[in-house]
Amino acid sequence: MSDESHPHERHMTPRKLFYLALGSVGVVYGDIGTSPLYAFREALKPVAHDGVTRFEVISLISLMIWALTIIVTIKYVLFLLRADNDGEGGTLSLLALLMKTANGHTALLMLLGLMGAALFLGDAMITPALSVLSAVEGLKLVTPSLAEYIVPISVVILALLFVVQSRGTGAVAKFFGPITAVWFLVMAAAGISHISDDFGILAAFNPYYAVSFLLHEGFYGVVVLGAVFLTVTGAEALYADLGHFGRRPIQWAWFLLVFPALTLNYLGQGALVLGKPETMSDPFYLMYPQWALLPVVILATAATIIASQAVITGAFSLVRQGINLGFLPRMEILFTSETNTGQIFLPSVNAVLFFGVIFLVLSFKTSDALATAYGISVTGAMVVTSIMAFEFVRARWNWSLPVAVIALAPLVVLEMIFLGANLLKIHDGGYIPILIATAFTVVMWTWRRGTAILMEKTRHTDIPLASFVSSIERKSEHSPAQVPGTAIFLTSDPESAPAALLHNLKHNHVLHDRNVILTIRTVNKPRVPSHDRYKVEPISERFSRVELLFGFMESQNVSQALATLRKTGLKFDIMSTSFYLGRRKLVPDAKSGMPYWQDRLYIALANAAANPSDYFRLPANRVVELGSHVII
């Protein structure tokens, strides 16, 4: 993103910059802000088998600080935030941009993008479960007798979180930033208060300790990397939420608040363990005096709920992008705000996430156990993003191959090492995110492939629209009766006569005064300006071809978009217009090009898809559906 390409950033007032930066603290940094609850604790475990040494503690903190510096600061904050698609970030946004310039390896790029999106959806299940569990576990330090109630309390909190999604969070979202900012300030204060326990912890800024530890610890060093990576979980949110806040507010929030607070807190935890080794069982909560524990647990729970909310909202947005880009079937999308079309609720996605999150909490029961499963989905998503970023700088910024390799290969290698370290935890629950991501990838790939096969098969039997119109406009005794009004026929192929039009002629023997062949197309950019929304092409006296263009971040409100067509002279009353939709009954074919099980999956997805009249927000009492059988 450049300031020139986004005038609202170039002319942003200091006041607006402050409020956007504050808002980004709650949404963008909520996930990474909950990592101190468990990251250092988990990193200590692999080396605690024979007691931790001073060198090991300083080295672990050094690894965490430099992971935050290299992966979050350099890769995401300074580099990836500039690799935008008209201001939007995220895996599918980057994929949509690359699809415009892909040369010969479109399928590989698509598969990578789908894997990245699937890993993010897996992360959307694990993050709420792990974050809330880790916060509520602080209760056992307040009152040990509450230990047995941690799982039930976590389940209740998470259940309430998913229940309120349908009502929207607009009313309380304005508090997310301030609450999370207080959380970061409290963490920073706790860190500062304990650095004096052992000023030797400041040596962690020296990368010598991080490198030396990895070189000397061997296998344990690799295992530790899996836990160290927990410090950077949530970094993908920086890129995914780029379009909501803009580059500068996200960068300012990182450098002025988030990065310093995280660094100070990790230094404080390290100094505490150096001074009091017995605190390594839970260094985060043991930084606070007994009287402050309950307020900190409450604040931590609020912060984890906000982090979970941000991930859930991100999942809704990602799925809508997937639907609009043709990677997922249409789903019911409800708008929870009358003024902000970005505030959406997808009941089916909410249900899948809810059951997945509750299953994880009941299965793993502790944040210790769940943390082992967490890193794989995040490291996988980061590796995918880095590979796609390599393609981006080559295709969009015209970097030469040597420059791109020199700049990005070290990042990819580092993240591959982190991924390898996390893969060591497959038997301890690491298989869970792999299974989740595989399932989502198969669903998206099946939908994309099945839709392409279906279009190819129907194209062989379709009648070219130009030929059809030419024949129907010739007057003869067999011409259909003409009736007043306008008929709009929705079709995915503007070059062929819609099946609904042919069936209407076959069964009703009528043709309207005005007939519009309407195609809805999603372009590979986030939004389409209103003056570029439509393309109108007269075919004959009674037929017109109209194409409505939407960005992948937009709601496809066809009724509203058609109202703008009046500017072209194509006048009609939406409430006296009939919309004709084709409904296909799909039948599996052994020679479809996909395995039988994939045929069945595609048909199941098609049957479960939202009704197009609801999805495109057409007036229900003006819609006519005509069915047909199609063998896929």
UniProtKB/Swiss-Prot annotation:
Q: Does the keyword Membrane apply?
A: yes
GO molecular function, a single term: potassium ion transmembrane transporter activity
Keywords recorded for this protein, A-Z: Cell inner membrane, Cell membrane, Ion transport, Membrane, Potassium, Potassium transport, Symport, Transmembrane, Transmembrane helix, Transport
Instruction: Give the bilayer topology.
Output: Multi-pass membrane protein
Q: Where in the cell is it found?
A: Cell inner membrane
One of its Pfam families is K_trans_C
Chain segments annotated as transmembrane = 17-37, 60-80, 106-126, 144-164, 175-195, 210-230, 254-274, 292-312, 344-364, 370-390, 401-421, 426-446
Catalytic function, reaction form: K(+)(in) + H(+)(in) = K(+)(out) + H(+)(out)
> An example Gene Ontology cellular component term from the record?
plasma membrane
Q: Which InterPro entries match?
A: K+_transporter, K_trans_C, K_trans_N, Kup
**What is this protein's function per UniProt?**
Transport of potassium into the cell. Likely operates as a K(+):H(+) symporter.
Name the family the entry cites: Belongs to the HAK/KUP transporter (TC 2.A.72) family.
| Protein name according to UniProt | Probable potassium transport system protein Kup 1
Instruction: Provide the species name.
Output: Rhizobium etli (strain ATCC 51251 / DSM 11541 / JCM 21823 / NBRC 15573 / CFN 42)
Record gene name: kup1
